[in-house]
Amino acid sequence: MSATVKSNAGNFFEDFRPGQILAHATPQTLTEGDVALYRALTGGRYAQYSSAEFAKAAGLPGLCIDPLHAFHVVFGKTVPDISLNAVANLGYADGRFLRPVMPGDTLRAVSEVIGRKENSTGRTGVVWVRTTGLDQRGEEVLSYVRWVMVNKRDPESPAAETMVPQLPEAVPASELTGYPAMAAWDFAASGSRHVLEDYEIGERINHVDGMTVQEAEHQIATRLYQNTAKVHFDFHGQKASRFGKRLVYGGVVISVARSLAFNGLGNAGQILAINAGTHAGPLFAWDTIYAWSEVLDKAELSQTCGALRLRLVAVKDTDPGAFAWKDSAGRYDPAVLLDFDYWAAIPRAR
């Protein structure tokens, strides 16, 4: 009697082809309960994602889903098809948040393979995908490119044809969309008086506060996004891994660091685009995340709304005021967890 394999072993490097379209399971409806749990797990304090009245006065439709929350949900959909057999998630580029996601919206994800390159060892390769998140109306709410190092099924199989996509260094400010009017911004309620004109290119901001990540918290957060990557959950299996223990999902680092950035960037709560992102080092339970930011650029989007291009650097177990980043050879400091380049909306001076 023959047996049929019904479980999903995930795709290996040989399974990916440029131009391939992957429609991911499972659609997820986001509710106000998701909003509350995300806030509890990340410590988010940005006013437009805390107060429905503030959000509406600022020009948003109401209490929206934090863009990073939507990003993690869309990312989570892709894991069973793209990164179940991944060695590492290497980076992000050309991320665009196109319209607000509201409680009650249902998100699904579709990815296109846009590149691949086998590594010199012959055991792994890098796969580039462009993922689009769509709502229940079929409207695009976000899109981004990421690249992943994936194991080969058979290290002896012939090398695949190389195709490396050309990606923009940053999303141009002229192409930013989805920003609100910010005409009736309540500075007392937002907790900050600082506007676009108060920030200078090259300025560095120490976000001061730290947050220690615990085992239960990071696993609940990762489950919230329906991310099934083995490295975050399988305590027994990870004993034989490179680190010998579970790894915290990189999205936890991004969201916690962004929440810490409230102290210094309290009016820059809405992410408009992701220019680049690198997970420079691993985070484990009981590590403490700190963060600092550098202003890379600024732009005027309307009479009342501007944008800051920011580099957010998350570090672990070290003083963020030391501004750890890279050495003279371009290598990341061992304390650096995340190097995240993004655009955020911010009100302009009245």
Task: Give short role names for the model-derived ranges.
Residues 38, 92, 107-111, 127-131, ...:
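Short, structured motif recognition centered on aromatic/hydrophobic residues
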Residues 94-95, 136, 187, 276, ...:
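Short linear motifs in intrinsically disordered/low-complexity regions
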Residues 61-65, 97-102, 161, 280-285:
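Short amphipathic alpha-helical patches
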Residues 2-18, 101-179, 183-184, 285, ...:
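HotDog/MaoC-like acyl-thioester-processing domains
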Residues 88-99, 114-115, 270-281, 296:
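A cross-kingdom feature marking solvent-exposed beta-strand/loop segments within repeated
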Residues 2-90, 142, 152-274, 330-339, ...:
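Hot-dog-fold acyl-thioester-processing enzymes
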